[in-house]
Amino acid sequence: MTRFWCVNILRIATLYYIIAVALAMYLYPGGNHIELDQIGYSFHKNFLSELGFYKTMSGDINFLSSFFFNSAMYVLLLQGVAFLFIPKLFRDNRYSFAFSCIGTFFIIPACIFFVGVGLTPGDLYFEAHIFTTTTAFNLYTVAIFFYAIAFIFSPLSNYYASGSILLFIAVGVYAYYLAGFNPIDPINDRELFLSTYSMDFLIFNVLIQKIIITLMLLTIIIFTFGLDKLIKHQK
């Protein structure tokens, strides 16, 4: 049961997220924040959250794409549940255990807010969508920081800690960037959006977001190998 929640569920949820988002990209009708006539999904021009729009920027109903994207968000709740079981793997060291508990305290609401990203499509609830997105990243940043410390005090190699520290720095910088960024609604404030942001700026932000998300997914997978070793260490 411990390996099921602490290793298997994390891997299954991550794999499902990747598959569901890939399907959502394939089924996305088209349009981005600047080019409304774009056909299909562009990896470097569309944000991931656009997959959850009720209507795309091109004005098309986005039912199928949003269905798979939202299901990927909901699966993150399983990761939140999994992290309830993880702190006990660090119980051999009181510092590791304490820091992992703090990490879990932050990562569970982070997963809930990531679900909120799907529940607040940006084309309908722009301000709520921005709030859930920034809050999710902020909470996740703090959680990764404490889990990095937990791995440092654990009997495992600091390889796992170093990876999470690098992610903490990357996500932390991105969260700081989002905090200082003044988002403009590309639908209701379209003229202001087009006069403020260029295509190069859009592409930069889209690619940065995808890099951060990719690092987050890789870190979870790397964590599972470290957690699996902790399970074997306790036997």
Language-model regions, residue ranges each:
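Hydrophobic cores of alpha-helical transmembrane segments in multi-pass inner/ER membrane proteins
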Residues: 14-18, 72-82, 138-147, 211-226
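N-terminal signal-anchor transmembrane alpha helix
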Residues: 4-33
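Membrane-proximal helix-loop-helix units in multi-pass membrane proteins
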Residues: 106-156
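Individual transmembrane alpha-helix segments
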Residues: 55-89
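Juxtamembrane "helix-exit" motif on the non-cytosolic side of transmembrane helices
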Residues: 88-91, 116-124, 176-184
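Terminal transmembrane helical module of multi-pass membrane proteins
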Residues: 144-235
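Extracytosolic (periplasmic/ER-lumenal) interhelical loops and adjacent juxtamembrane/interface segments
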Residues: 33-61
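Cytoplasmic juxtamembrane regions at transmembrane-helix boundaries
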Residues: 78-109, 234-235
